Amino acid sequence: MERRTFLRGAVIGTSAATFGGTLMRGAAYAAPAQNGPGPYGALGTADANGVQLPSGFTSRVIARSSQAVSGTSYTWHNAPDGGACFADGTGWIYVSNSEINPSGGASAVKFNSSGSITGAYRILSNTRQNCAGGATPWNTWLSCEEVSLGYVYETDPWGVNAATRRNAMGKFKHEAAAADPVRKVIYLTEDESNGCLYRFIPTTWGNLSSGTLQVLVAGTGTSGSFSWSNVPDPDGSPTVTRDQVSGAKRFNGGEGCHYANDTVWFTTKGDNRLWQLNLANSTYELAYDDSLVNPGAAPLTGVDNVTGSSSGDLFVAEDGGNMEICVITPDDVVAPFLRITGQSSSEITGPAFSPDGTRLYFSSQRGTSGSSSGGITYEVTGPFRTSP
């Protein structure tokens, strides 16, 4: 397998390396990632919030489903899922999807420069099973419906402009989105056991009202070269998008997606893999596969949402597993970064860093109750590294 290039940069959202166009410097990245000691050391005992963290890190709960967000009158949504952060003057905004059907959507929490909550509000309503999504360079949040023939909705993190359904981005079981400001495209994962990876090329970059939907075409192996082919009917009817192009590569349950200059990473839950597209030479390969971890048991299972930090580390959330967010370093080590205890019927969702990279936001979708009304959204603060 060829060596990979892991590209570093500031990340301010679930899928962006960035969506703001920050370029990343390269480093050799051998593959696949293997079990080893993480850069932050061992996890400590669970804190008052039930979160095990490395030394120097602390957690706080910023919102609970069905309860008013602290300091506001806004009731936080059920089943919090994918999320991203957006700079807002000296503060920032964290947006979060609601993965329920019907009456899904997305909400936002606003913070000032000291991290205090200053507001919370709805940015999308009455949609279905809003799972993950992605930020854009023009500071909107793409909220994806994880239902058959689902849509992508473009939303305003400030809640000023009405959300817009982006039909041209295709109707399928959407999961996540990642914008590539260099090629001016948006990559889209599909949560089907025989799903595909797509890219959307807007007619005009910054305007998602029209454009071309393409699907990745490649062989059946875990590495090789790839190309893109137009999807004839993005509407997906009568033939679903994944069955319209001969040779479209199949992926077992597409989940999170993350772009860093010239590289796309995305997870597949059906086989616990993290894939990598090397855009500069149009090749693909595995960045992680839990069945290839040696020695010892794989620390990362139930792969789901993925984001990155300014050090070049990837942070991958578990759907189930033992409720961890694991870190994959540029030198191919995978290790737990945090673990949530007492919530075995939940999953971790929506990891996203604040614009300055010092705070990590995420949710436990069903919390201690195992119910969508029991979701908990967290913030972790600490000495996140800025270089490998």
Per-segment meaning from a language model:
Residues 94-102, 143-146, 188-191, 266-270, ...:
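Conserved beta-strand positions in repeat-built beta-propeller and related beta-rich domains
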Residues 74-89, 126-137, 171-185, 246-263, ...:
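Beta-rich, blade/repeat-based domains predominating
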Residues 352-388:
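Blade-level signature of beta-propeller repeat domains, shared across WD40, Kelch, NHL, RCC1
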Residues 5-28:
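N-terminal export signals
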Residues 50-78, 86-121:
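Beta-propeller domains
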Residues 48-65, 111-124, 154-173, 209-210, ...:
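Blade-edge beta-strand/turn elements of extracellular beta-propeller
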Residues 269, 296-333:
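Loop/turn-rich, solvent-exposed surfaces of beta-rich toroidal or solenoidal domains
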